[in-house]
Regions:
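Short hydrophobic beta-strand element within catalytic cores of glycosyltransferases
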Residues: 38, 288, 297-299
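Active-site donor-binding acidic/aromatic loop of nucleotide-activated sugar
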Residues: 239-242, 252-261, 268
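Aromatic "clamp/platform" in nucleotide-sugar-dependent glycosyltransferases that forms part
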Residues: 92, 261, 280
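A short, active-site helix/loop in glycosyltransferases that binds the activated sugar's phosphate group
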Residues: 140-179
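A conserved mid-protein helix/loop that constitutes part of the nucleotide-sugar donor-binding site
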Residues: 14-22, 198, 202-221, 227, ...
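N-terminal strand-loop element at the rim of the active site
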Residues: 6-14, 18, 22-68, 165-166, ...
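Acidic donor-binding loop of glycosyltransferase active sites
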Residues: 270-283, 296-297
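A short helix/loop element that forms part of the nucleotide-sugar donor recognition site in Leloir-type
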Residues: 73, 179-193
Length: 299
């Protein structure tokens, strides 16, 4: 059996986490098994991962304690790297490529870097680190994957993109989960008290990238035209309270629902009438694919 060490799972069941789990659920686990190296003490889908046979190893996050992170990562790799035929690192920027550096040092022969974004809102220092690591990633990783052609230049220079080890791996979803279902639509619209509303949906963490402020401004104009519009915001994040305050200031609390993190997002699509994703940047937004699979008009 080939064992793959996977990095990319956090405490948030977001886009990258969904991509990883979609593959994990559908691979032949008699031939390939995933283990997960995480820097979060709470891991999305943890129970499911364990039920599928995967192991989860948790280390300190680099942002919490850099030196402890390096010690724990070194200790893990020195004691476990020999078990793995590959490491698959799923990230949105090249600020932290230590997982690949240590994987190379301790002998993991196949080292996959998988790009999941087309830009980043990092400050000056992190942007400089990203650019520096972009120049050297070609000598650290062995395989260079990207979720889209638009995202690739953010991670890879022309030399990498012209090489045989570069590949576009488009995000995959199980379309059957999102098939239109009138019974679910009726059930969820009833639960939310939205039987007669025009439901505008958005799924994403409350973060600068997702552009919630702009979405609220647009929604305010919609409500002026038709009071039956209702905005459904699915997710959580550091800007959630700020967005709630903006909604309050605009007097829209009755027209906007905040659901928090949901593990039944595929069902929430059923109650929507239109899906909006006004992100400042995306690699290949998996929620947009899911919404289209649910036959929703998407903006």
């Amino acid at each position: 059996m080939n064992k793959i060490l996977v990095f990319g799972m956090t405490d948030n069941p977001g886009g990258i986490e969904s991509v990883i789990m979609n593959y994990y659920r559908n691979i032949n686990r008699k031939k390939i098994q995933f283990d997960f190296l995480c820097n979060s003490q709470i891991v999305a889908y943890e129970d499911e991962i364990k039920s599928l046979g995967g192991k989860i190893y948790k280390i300190t996050a680099r942002k919490d304690n850099y030196f402890k992170f390096k010690r724990e990562l070194r200790a893990f790799m020195s004691g476990n790297a020999f078990k793995y035929s590959a490491i698959w690192v799923n990230i949105c920027s090249l600020v932290n490529i230590d997982y690949l550096i240590f994987a190379k040092k301790y002998g993991i022969t196949r080292r996959i870097i998988h790009c999941h974004n087309s830009d980043n809102d990092a400050g000056f220092i992190k942007s400089c680190v990203h650019k520096f690591n972009k120049m050297r990633i070609g000598k650290i990783a062995t395989d260079f994957w990207s979720c889209s052609e638009e995202a690739s230049p953010w991670f890879f220079d022309k030399t990498v993109m012209q090489g045989e080890a570069y590949e576009i791996i488009t995000n995959a979803i199980d379309v059957k989960k999102y098939k239109q279902n009138d019974a679910l639509r009726k059930k969820y619209r009833s639960e939310f008290g939205l039987e007669n509303n025009i439901v505008v949906g958005h799924v994403g963490r409350f973060h600068f990238q997702k552009n919630h402020k702009f979405l609220i401004d647009i929604f305010e104009e919609l409500v002026k035209r038709n009071s039956q519009y209702h905005l459904l915001l699915v997710g959580q994040g550091e800007l959630e309270e700020e967005i709630k305050n903006i909604v309050k200031e605009k007097g829209l609390m009755k027209q906007v629902s905040f659901t928090g993190v949901r593990m039944d997002v595929e069902n929430l699509y059923q109650m929507m009438d239109i899906f909006v994703l006004p992100s400042v940047f995306e690699g290949l937004g998996i929620v947009a694919l899911e919404a289209q699979a649910a036959s929703l008009p998407c903006l």
